[in-house]
């Protein structure tokens, strides 16, 4: 399909990425409609996918996506947890509509539902796990693009992109390459290297992320709390001036009023006793 155009040919860098992500590894069984994409069969029974055919179908899918006038009418779907991050990233860069997680039955056929949508094109991660939107798309004549393994059913699938759909890295890499080709056809990026790395499309287990964060915190050096520095004023050269300035600066507390206070310590400061009350027994004689 790419012909002799060097721009559309498969680059060595892309082949290296595919091999590192195990995109070429199929399954032990093969669908009769996927036999045309199988390169050979290993001795252990695993089928090897032809990466040249994979890239050709990827370019064909990118041309179909770029032909849609409004990018929001392209729906990217993944009910498998390993492909949800890739779907969200793809929708972010291409302005598509993502459906990550469980697909609501009847979203394409039941107009009474609040989640009713009318997309012009569907892209699914795996037609085996995303069979519900693929089946509903066949009822309303919506074309479907799907990433298919050697054993994936291709019924109601218009464009099948052969790849390894059981590997988290393979799924993320294929979504990344599809987004890159779509942006190139739209003229958003050049045919040079795209600054977005494929790692952003890979699935990350939350538990593994927490373990990595804990390991980083454990390896970081422990910084003890350092007390604040005490600011000490410079000693004055003249003690008289310092005492005067300190006395003027510090407010003096008001003296407590003490009843009957005397300057002479020898005098008795005891207050005289109050006169006794009249006796209840009668008047004194």
From Swiss-Prot:
Residues of the signal peptide: none
Key words of the record: Cytoplasm, Ribonucleoprotein, Ribosomal protein
Lineage top rank: taxon: Eukaryota
Major site of localization recorded for this protein: cytoplasm
One term of GO molecular function: structural constituent of ribosome
Location within or outside the cell: Cytoplasm
A GO biological-process term: ribosomal small subunit assembly
Record-level GO cellular component terms: cytosolic small ribosomal subunit
Pfam families hit by this protein: 40S_SA_C, Ribosomal_S2
InterPro entries xrefs: Ribosomal_uS2 (IPR001865), Ribosomal_uS2_C (IPR032281), Ribosomal_uS2_CS (IPR018130), Ribosomal_uS2_euk (IPR027498), Ribosomal_uS2_euk/arc (IPR005707), Ribosomal_uS2_flav_dom_sf (IPR023591)
Coiled coil: none
Bias (Low complexity): 271-285
Entry-linked CDD domains: RPS2
Similarity comment: family membership: Belongs to the universal ribosomal protein uS2 family.
Purpose of the protein: Required for the assembly and/or stability of the 40S ribosomal subunit. Required for the processing of the 20S rRNA-precursor to mature 18S rRNA in a late step of the maturation of 40S ribosomal subunits.
Name listed for the protein in its UniProt record: Small ribosomal subunit protein uS2
């Amino acid at each position: 399909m790419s012909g002799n155009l060097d721009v559309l040919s498969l680059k060595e860098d892309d082949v290296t990425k595919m091999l590192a992500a195990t995109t070429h590894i199929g399954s032990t069984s093969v669908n009769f409609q996927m036999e045309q994409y199988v390169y050979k069969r290993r001795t252990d029974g695993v089928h090897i996918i032809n990466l040249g055919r994979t890239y050709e179908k990827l370019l064909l899918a990118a041309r179909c996506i770029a032909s849609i006038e409004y990018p929001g009418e392209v729906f990217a779907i993944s009910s498998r947890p390993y492909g949800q991050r890739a779907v969200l990233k793809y929708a972010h860069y291409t302005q598509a509509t993502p459906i990550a997680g469980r697909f609501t039955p009847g979203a394409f056929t039941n107009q009474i539902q609040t989640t009713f949508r009318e997309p012009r094109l569907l892209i699914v991660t795996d037609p085996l796990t995303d069979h519900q939107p693929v089946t509903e798309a066949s009822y309303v004549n919506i074309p479907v693009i799907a990433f298919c393994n050697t054993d994936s059913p291709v019924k109601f699938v218009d464009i099948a992109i052969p790849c390894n759909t059981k590997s988290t890295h393979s799924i993320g890499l294929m979504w990344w390459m599809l987004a890159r080709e779509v942006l190139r056809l739209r003229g958003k990026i050049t045919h040079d290297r795209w600054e977005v790395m494929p790692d952003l499309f890979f699935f990350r287990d939350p538990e593994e992320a927490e373990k990595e964060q804990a390991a980083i915190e454990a390896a970081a050096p422990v910084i003890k709390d350092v007390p604040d520095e005490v600011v000490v004023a410079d000693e004055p050269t003249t003690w008289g001036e310092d005492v005067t300035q300190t006395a003027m600066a510090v407010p003096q507390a008001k003296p407590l009023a003490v009843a009957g206070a005397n300057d002479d310590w020898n005098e008795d400061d005891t207050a005289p006793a109050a006169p006794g009350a009249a006796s209840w027994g009668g008047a004194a004689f």
